[in-house]
Amino acid sequence: MKIVADENLAFTDYFFSEFGEIQHRAGRLLTAHDVSDAEALLVRSVTKVNQALIEHSQLKFVGSATIGTDHLDISALQQQDILWSNAPGCNAQAVAEYVITALYHLDSDVFERGQDFTLGIIGLGNVGRRLAKMAALLGWNVIGCDPFVQLPDIHNLSFDDVLQKSDAISVHVPLTHSGSHPTFHLFDQHAFASMPASTILINSARGPVIEEQALIQDIYQTGRKVVLDVFEHEPVISEQLLDVVNLVTPHIAGYSLEGKARGTQMIYDAFCKVFGYEASKKFETQLPVCEPFFQQQDLKQILKAHLRAIYDIAQDDHNLRACVKDGQVDQCAFDQLRKEYPLRREWAAHGGPVA
């Protein structure tokens, strides 16, 4: 069996080498020729799996080690009788920890504010729910907005109410262009006009959920603090945008070792089910032991003392800004940052809590 895999997927050799030949490819550059004689394709969100890519292939299975599926043309896969799977929730814990780290980077007193700090969460799926639980451990007031989810322990308000009542807003929605609640340009000039100037905005979901030019104008007018891990025109990222945003990272919010390994594990499990193999391997056996930072009882004090050692988010910001060339981020350098990213560990690896 020939298996084509994105070169940046974690542990592909460990999980898949026993099944046949693995060809590692740059996901953004994958072509129809690359997959023409493959039976399985393993991708990330940078690969657009569409009719042009798969129509002349022998593919029987496509696995995407991602939460989202907007890069997969589901109807095209179904027309070709190609089974597919993604990895919902694989890096949800990592993203939740990223958001908390970003907030602490912007406000070193945020852990002391307790119920006086209101975190608004847009989208209460795998990531949003985990973030809400982690925020509750820190004593924050949590409100949310999700027309498709009702959770008994989260105040689910209207979108406008969350915009108006939050000290910080974190976005965790899929990218959708149709339906009753499309998320494309959910944050436009009207949304920004509803938000107090002091409200922090964090987007680690999908770039086009925020209208970039409206965001830039809002920051000019309000001085709003903003954190972006995703960008509307990614991998095209303008220097104009970077100049006004407080914290930028190269689409790595979910890049923990556990998150990436878990994503590959999930598509491995699906692969085995499709092809009739026993799924006997577990990613946990491949992870090294970490220093146990969380040995005390006071979570806030532990985070204040060790959060930077666990994840230095400022370094990611510096590295992305260093990729600017001729007015925008160099796309090759952007992809290289992600390819060579030193995967951080989730708090649980250090003895910390899991949502």
Curated annotation (Swiss-Prot):
Gene Ontology MF terms: 4-phosphoerythronate dehydrogenase activity; NAD binding; protein dimerization activity
Active site: 206, 234, 251 (proton donor)
Organism superkingdom: Bacteria
Claim: Mitochondrion is one of the keywords in the record: no
Subcellular localization(s) per the UniProt record: Cytoplasm
HAMAP family noted in UniProt: PdxB
This protein's name: Erythronate-4-phosphate dehydrogenase
UniProt organism field: Acinetobacter baylyi (strain ATCC 33305 / BD413 / ADP1)
Name of encoding gene: pdxB
